[in-house]
Amino acid sequence: MPNIKDQLDVIKISGVDAETFIQGQITNDISLLSEEKKSIYAGYCSPKGRLLAFFFITRIDKNYFLFCPPCISEAISKRLSMYVLRAKVEITCSPDNVDYFLIDESDIQKVPDNLISKPQNKLQSTLSNDKSISLTMLDGSKSYYLIFGDNKEISKLYDEIYSTEIKPCNWNEIHINNLIPNIFNETQDLYIPQSVNLDLIGAVNFKKGCYTGQEVVARTHYLGKPKRRMYLGSVTLNKNPELGSDIK
């Protein structure tokens, strides 16, 4: 199976207080993970309202899975653990019993219906009958799908799907082409959510309760405007620029 774990890691948050705990940490409303919409994008901010992480979040049963780049996942997991206090929550970085891969909209039709039904809407998820596998349609101008779940079942599903010669996808390329941001070590604590368009892709909810950094994010929304916005462009260079470099 192609390994996308060099681009994408996962933090598992479980326990009876998991939803309440996550709600106080992220820019989006975790209660949106309903039966109709089981996935969201969300930011995780410092007290200054600047992004420390950008998550794709999905859920299987009462377990929440926060996807982010592996270069920050362990540190973010440890930071989240600092705020658990007395909450009945367990946080696990890179759980051993899960796996995942990506396919695009041209190949999703090759997935046999008897394996798992296909979601019809962006950021909607469907579950296999035994709830061991989740299939989520990602957002963007072109649809991509994240197949995620129990590692043994994912391996079986992958072998069945790829017998039809489906080609795997690149997570970072998907984000770039669909104007979805990401936060890496080099870009942590540099940008407020609006600077990388989180408010434009539904990753910030201005009606939810408090979370770390909310005051700065809300003040920009209601009283001002962001000094920066994210755009897609291309340039020819002799070498790749460092992440977070200024463009002049």
Give the residues covered by each predicted segment:
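Basic, glycine/lysine-rich polyanion-binding surfaces/domains
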Residues: M1-K207, Y211-K248
